[in-house]
Every structure is written in C-alpha cells, then in structure tokens.
Amino acid sequence: GVRLVGSEMCIRDRVTHCPHCLHTIGKEYAKFDDGQFETIHHTELLADLLKQEKLKPTKQVNEELTYHDPCYLGRHHGEYDAPRTVLESIPGIKIKEMEKNKDKALCCGMGGGNMWYEVHEGKDIVENRLEHVGETKVEKLATSCSFCMINFNSGKGKVKKTEELQIEDVASILSKSIE
C-alpha cells in the first residue's frame, strides 16, 4: 500500500500477480533495498481483504474445479493457503484437490523454460500434470500464475481428459462473485 509521510508518498508494500516476479522482486531485489518493502502475491492480498470483510463474495458461482499450486508461489514462497482461502470464500465453488498438491504438486513445466524443451521420448512435463488434472474429472483448473495458465492452455490438447478444460486465475473466479 501507499501511505503519506508528511507531504511525501511512501511505498510500503508491493503486490505482484506473477509468482516468478514475487520471487525476483521479493527475494532477489530485496537484497538491494534492505528488505524494507514487503512483497506479496495478489492471492495473499485478496485473502486478507476477505478476512477483513472488505471484499464480500455474494453471487453464486456453481463450479467444481481443481487448483494447481504454482512452484514459485508454493515451494519457493511457502504460500498454499491464500489461493484456497479465496476459492473457498466463493459461494458454490467446490474444490476437488489433485492427489499431488501443495508441497507435493508437480511443476506445470513452464519454469526453467521447460515448455520449449523438445521431448523425444516420454511425455512433456505439462502432460504429466494435466493427467493429474484429468483424474479429478473437473471442467475447470484454477491457478494463480499466468505462466502456468499459458502452459496448461497450450498443453491441454495433448491429454484426452483435458481437451475441453477451462483454465482460469483465482482472482478472475472471485470477480464473478463480487457485486
């Protein structure tokens, strides 16, 4: 947030949409600003606003979905609860967890540029993760990383059970329930 100190504006916190940026700005760049700015992911901000009742999801959103934990939000930042808190606050949302979730979740394959790696034998990383999604038999995959969304959208045709899968950001799903 921004606060006024005397007649000057001071930036106190930073919010990122991208978990990769969260890592870079919050951990790498923090070395240069002595860690004086807190950097949080947008799902952490949304979860906090929901807890403070500054956001109130009221519209019914009848969807069954599964949630994919992005590597940089989960394993690198330790945040697994905020996206689920946001989704669970939405009336009508039913979350069907994949067997491998939270700290056991597999990468979507976008991290480290694996999306562009040509696999000659076996399956792409995204195919492995999409098979886990397919096992849940849901029509929607929620995530909170735009890189994951891009990779899942480009890979969903490779796995029969996920050809028609809808992929959507947690904040976008929440917005359907806010009046």
Question: What name fits each language-model region?
Answer:
Residues 72-89:
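Active-site glycine- and acidic-residue-rich loops that bind
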Residues 45, 55-77:
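Catalytic cores of enzyme domains
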Residues 15-24, 68-77, 102-117, 139-154:
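Local cysteine-cluster metal-coordination motifs and their immediate loop/turn environment
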Residues 121-139:
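A short, acidic, amphipathic alpha-helical segment used as a generic capping/interface helix at domain edges
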Residues 35-59, 100-103, 160-179:
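Short, flexible loop segments at boundaries between secondary-structure elements
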Residues 1-11:
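Single conserved hydrophobic/aromatic residue that forms the stacking wall/gate
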Residues 12-45:
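Helix-enriched interaction subdomains in cytosolic or periplasmic regions
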Residues 93-99, 117-126:
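Long, compositionally biased charged/polar accessory segments in the mid-to-C-terminal portions
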